[in-house]
Amino acid sequence: PTEIEPFGGAATCLGGAIRDPLSGRSYVYQAMRVTGAADPLKPVSETMPGKLPQRKLVTTAAAGYSSYGNQIGLATGQVSELYHPGYAAKRMEIGAVVGATPASHVRREEPAPGDVVILLGGRTGRDGVGGATGSSKAHKLTSLETCGAEVQKGNAPIERKLQRLFRREDACRLIKRCNDFGAGGVSVAIGELADGLHIDLNKVTRKYEGLDGTELAISESQERMAVAVAAEDAETFMKYAAEENLEATIVATVTEEKRMREVW
């Protein structure tokens, strides 16, 4: 994604790295960034067809990464940028983080029929639709104009609220299983929580109107979490979320039938 939209791509490199351990209830306190680029001093006129100039990639990606890190309050103790002609065709953007949490905060159980899944955090938009395949497919001369929507739009303040909520033992102990929203959106993040699920896409909170069922199912909009809790704990968990100024909505129910069904 950094190759297509360097600011948002580098920002979600860090944001995505934070969300992975966060779904395991870990608080991230340190980061590392390693990138690869061709010569940024090369004249713009010598830029490969269909590519952004290396200078644009290098400076804008650094701004995107630092913007997200500053807003969420995360220190990046190691930053290295490698320069090699081989990165002219495709930039390298690697982020790594370190996190930890008290073992007493973590509860891991198999969700049971009747349990509910709460969508927590950011709202859903068209940003990130197709991102899972976009990061791996071959890019063409037209990619800069056609693939921008595949890059997720980060929202660090919401992720910081998620971090605050997940540092609360009373909230974390209610969570049986949790998933962050990466590749595949609702279909994967919620679909992986249990073998049997009934997902109501109409209840997914939206950034704006006009999204169809497919977009709601596969959008990779960031700063969202899916948590499975017992039905009797749902109201309490959503109260804790509201105390951290986070939106929380029940969007799915765990079923006995071992099949995922999405309705819209």
Residues covered by each model-derived region:
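Glycine/proline-enriched, intrinsically flexible loops and inter-domain linkers
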Residues: 1-264
